[in-house]
Amino acid sequence: MLNPQLNRHGELIHLLSTEGLPRRIIEQILDLAATFVPAPGQEFPKLPLLHGKSVFNLFFENSTRTRTTFEIAAKRLSADVVNLNIAASSTSKGESLLDTIANLSAMQADLFVVRHGASGAPYLIAQHVAPHVHVINAGDGRHAHPTQALLDMYTIRHHKGDFNQLTVAIVGDVLHSRVARSDIHALTTLGVPEVRVVAPATLLPEGLAQMGVRVCTDMEEGLRDADVVIMLRLQNERMRGALLPSAHEYFKHYGLTQARLALARPDAIVMHPGPMNRGVEIASEVADSGQAVILDQVTFGIAVRMAAMSLVAGVRP
């Protein structure tokens, strides 16, 4: 089966999901990102790699961090950036998604960064753009968020070096989390021997065992001796029905406190894709501790998105 993310030479042309993404491509993105990360106290480099190219940020769902970091990344690569106000756009007036893409392509778009509430929307767009136009998925429904997963992998590699002896715990609302799915695919591809998914039964999707993870409904069991703890927020906006008694009850059983973190390895790192709900999935004492590398994730996210845009466009330093 052909991989829609790669051309016939096996080169990355769209970044749609970490599922099916070869290890060599993931490592290529991480290695290139490392060349973009500034030294402490320095700014991100300004490079001419996408000079003359137009990057269209199409966010059909609200976002602050992701849209902003994509915009910064594109500008650091000297691209022209267009941020489309979807709420005021023609899609809200009845124009189809593909008609919108066709019209924007006629404006000489070279790269679409797409966030959409419908799973698979970036795939659909990638199937209908011209060969010289590229698509990066910035999050689609519950399905995938590949650049978040890649910046998570970069953060883990930066702090832990190797993947092949790690135990990684992903904790929280896995049912609604595209980040969890993308992280699981990336972690297993990179050879992490034990990936644990920790959540109440009502927030666990079906089919996790087939993804090669260990499922835990007990927080203490899931955290014990973990090297990396990735916390997920409760996505109340995607919940239908009473999946949880209350946020207070959730924190009581699944919130990451200092006492619970002590079950992990002493040098464990704590990650979170943001935005954080302090006092719901994570205690402030943990979020503000030396073990939390959440702000590193934000910084590395710019470099990883610079790398992803460069590679899909077929350019590199």
Swiss-Prot record:
Q: Which residues does carbamoyl phosphate bind?
A: 65-66, 115, 145, 148, 274-275
Specify the protein name: Aspartate carbamoyltransferase catalytic subunit
Q: What does this protein do?
A: Catalyzes the condensation of carbamoyl phosphate and aspartate to form carbamoyl aspartate and inorganic phosphate, the committed step in the de novo pyrimidine nucleotide biosynthesis pathway.
Q: Which superkingdom heads the taxonomic lineage of this protein's source?
A: Bacteria
- Keywords of the record: Pyrimidine biosynthesis, Transferase
- The UniProt record lists the EC number as 2.1.3.2
Record-listed L-aspartate binding positions: 93, 178, 233
The family note in this entry says: Belongs to the aspartate/ornithine carbamoyltransferase superfamily. ATCase family.
Under the subunit heading, UniProt states:
Heterododecamer (2C3:3R2) of six catalytic PyrB chains organized as two trimers (C3), and six regulatory PyrI chains organized as three dimers (R2).
What PANTHER family does the database record attribute to this sequence?
A: ASPARTATE CARBAMOYLTRANSFERASE, ORNITHINE CARBAMOYLTRANSFERASE, MITOCHONDRIAL
SUPFAM superfamilies for this protein: Aspartate/ornithine carbamoyltransferase
Q: What does UniProt give as GO cellular component?
A: cytosol
- Pathway(s) the chain acts in: Pyrimidine metabolism; UMP biosynthesis via de novo pathway; (S)-dihydroorotate from bicarbonate: step 2/3
Entry's Gene Ontology BP terms:
'de novo' pyrimidine nucleobase biosynthetic process; 'de novo' UMP biosynthetic process; amino acid metabolic process
- Record GO terms (molecular function): amino acid binding; aspartate carbamoyltransferase activity
Known catalysed reaction(s)?
carbamoyl phosphate + L-aspartate = N-carbamoyl-L-aspartate + phosphate + H(+)
Name the residues that span the membrane: none
Looking up NCBIfam families in the UniProt record yields:
asp_carb_tr, PRK00856.1
